[in-house]
Amino acid sequence: MNKLKLIFAGTPDFAARHLAALLSSDHEVVAVYTQPDKPAGRGQKLTASPVKELALTHNLPVYQPASLRKEEAQAELASLGADLMVVVAYGLILPKVVLDTPRLGCINVHGSLLPRWRGAAPIQRSIWAGDTETGVTIMQMDVGLDTGAMIRKVTCPIAANETSTSLYDKLAELGPQALVDTINAMAAGETAAEEQDDALANYAEKLSKEEARIDWSMEAVAIDRCIRAFNPWPISWFEVAGQTIKVWQAEVINSDHGQPTGTLLKADKQGIDIATGLGVLRLLTLQPPGKKAMSVSDLLNSRRDWFEPGTQLN
């Protein structure tokens, strides 16, 4: 097997886990690209990405262009003489000239079984839609949005209580080994790519805080999926007594209620039961304004007046 010279491009922790796997492989990471440092925290202090932090601990050259569309940035990348560029949740668009620069092009690790869930939020949308299976796809990048030919797929089940946090961790365990296996196969000239069927494609739109507002007219199972999909961001929410309450955890109670949707049916230490379009949703872990997430029993100790049975939620 030939040893390949790699450029790695990525930004969040998910990407850093893949970089770590490459650093333990037989290949050479010659440079790392990541997003420019961004303000974070209450002090809005400029903060390096997880990928940059890992790269610096390994004394790797780090490049942080705001765009790869400028000739200067493209020439700089070309001067690295890489065989392959690996892209994992980088966050910048790669122009065709960049895609064509490395000898073997650019490959991407995507958190879904393409062509299902192309786009920005595949992990969240797979839970939101009620999928029972997802996985990681390694693809050869082209100029489209997640449209490139697929080199390798690995699958994993989506559990009934899966959140985006837990599924993210599952895929972050699966992806790195799949990536290393793919690069090893490419180095040996043993890969075969499969074109995507565009007729089977759908798009994982970005999440928004407004979308996370709970619609009690939906079925309880659908609301529960939203709550799990929007954890850890933007967190599903509703309003009661003029307060915005975030919902971190709930469960579906299969019972008829005969009440208008959004009616608060009962509130006790087991949970807060809400009438939905079909079935009852029991709220288990809530976060009131300015507080950390807490169990319903803890919240009722201080704010039972917000959750009187018969209260109508918007």
UniProtKB/Swiss-Prot annotation:
Residues reported to bind (6S)-5,6,7,8-tetrahydrofolate: S112, L113, L114, P115
Gene3D superfamilies linked to this entry: Formyl transferase, C-terminal domain (3.10.25.10), Formyl transferase, N-terminal domain (3.40.50.170)
InterPro entries: Fmt, Formyl_trans_C, Formyl_trans_C_sf, Formyl_transf_N, Formyl_transf_N_sf, Formyl_transferase-like_C_sf, GART_AS, Met-tRNA-FMT_C
Assigned EC number: 2.1.2.9
PROSITE patterns (alphabetical): GART (PS00373)
Annotated GO CC locations: cytosol
GO molecular-function term, one example from the UniProt record: methionyl-tRNA formyltransferase activity
Highest taxon in the source lineage: Bacteria
UniProt keyword list: Protein biosynthesis, Transferase
Keyword Signal: no
Catalytic activity: L-methionyl-tRNA(fMet) + (6R)-10-formyltetrahydrofolate = N-formyl-L-methionyl-tRNA(fMet) + (6S)-5,6,7,8-tetrahydrofolate + H(+)
A Pfam family reported for this protein in Swiss-Prot or TrEMBL: Formyl_trans_N
Family, as annotated: Belongs to the Fmt family.
Function: Attaches a formyl group to the free amino group of methionyl-tRNA(fMet). The formyl group appears to play a dual role in the initiator identity of N-formylmethionyl-tRNA by promoting its recognition by IF2 and preventing the misappropriation of this tRNA by the elongation apparatus.
Official protein name in the record: Methionyl-tRNA formyltransferase
Lineage: Bacteria, Pseudomonadati, Pseudomonadota, Gammaproteobacteria, Aeromonadales
Gene giving rise to this polypeptide: fmt
